[in-house]
């Protein structure tokens, strides 16, 4: 069963995950959110030794269920690679008795690298799924 995403402004405005990725915003100006949230069963004993990429596959496969496992693997493997200055991608570091998730190891040293590293792979994969051949441009600013 394919997970359906609806606009925050009109629950009748629904799309698949790949359509939401391509559209960005709903035609009514709303954001797309899942109609229902999938249950993601995560075994913490397994997760503690898993790579960032492995955890990403587990979580994203539940929310992007119209992507094949091969498509997700392609997106994740290419997005979270040596562009980051640590193999952990987003290490959890203990400092003064508190744990901090470091989201600054990407090319721009900003948390946005976490999302913007995978976005072009999601968009080009979604475009192929829908037979679109237009050039995709992603413009960002800090």
Outline where the language-model segments fall.
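PLP-dependent amino-acid enzyme catalytic core
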Residues: 1-142
